[in-house]
């Protein structure tokens, strides 16, 4: 019997996503034994500083990639929004699974919407993208850093440290916590991180056998959307921890991509969008990025 080992972070959401991939692989490849290799990453362990301060969301990948290089794992499963814009050699992404809900969620025990929050309410998020959109909608709010896995963040809310927090809808839904969503923060008024809600599977590009096993999980329509979003981010010279948002959707046989660059300090937002071919997501991403640059995005990004 062939065995495939999946490197994964230890958080409940990471384990859910990895088991979801494992179940899909078992269904596609009867007789394949799939096992999880849970690992702790520096991004999970250092919670008293922002991700940007300790090296960015790529920290969630490094230990998993090292496990693949050592031969301790065959592949790794990631939230695609945490994957750096460029992968180190020899790594590739043979599978992007069908996307979940890309929207953000307002979570509160007392208030049913962003508009219902009282003046000066304390809202928890460490995401500059979320902070920028919160400041644009409600400049009176007190925004407070909040890190940790989904359950840790919910516990901090429940302990009274915040009036509300902002999380990804997909993470809550995957953990069976749909009832915690007070309000969806949705397009076009509110845009998610590039590739939010999508799960990516990474392996070594020089391992043809593993690549072939994983490629059957690839969802082409999701891949086109998230590749356009990430192409826009790359063209902006962005990363996983800048106030950049993007969302692509299918319209007929092509894609419609919306992009945003914001300022977490004063809530200024710049938007641009374009239609394009799903066969040239790089071009679509570049055109939306250029639209943002034409409206002053470079100045906002330079102020970071």
From Swiss-Prot:
A cellular component annotation (GO) from this entry: cytoplasm
Domain of life where this protein originates: Bacteria
Key words, A-Z: Porphyrin biosynthesis, Transferase
Required co-factors: dipyrromethane
BP-aspect Gene Ontology terms: protoporphyrinogen IX biosynthetic process
Pfam families linked to this entry: Porphobil_deam, Porphobil_deamC
S-(dipyrrolylmethanemethyl)cysteine: modified positions: 240
EC annotation from Swiss-Prot or TrEMBL: 2.5.1.61
Stored SUPFAM superfamilies: Periplasmic binding protein-like II, Porphobilinogen deaminase (hydroxymethylbilane synthase), C-terminal domain
Biological or metabolic pathway of the protein: Porphyrin-containing compound metabolism; protoporphyrin-IX biosynthesis; coproporphyrinogen-III from 5-aminolevulinate: step 2/4
Additional observations: The porphobilinogen subunits are added to the dipyrromethane group.
Record protein name field: Porphobilinogen deaminase
Organism from which the protein derives: Xanthomonas oryzae pv. oryzae (strain PXO99A)
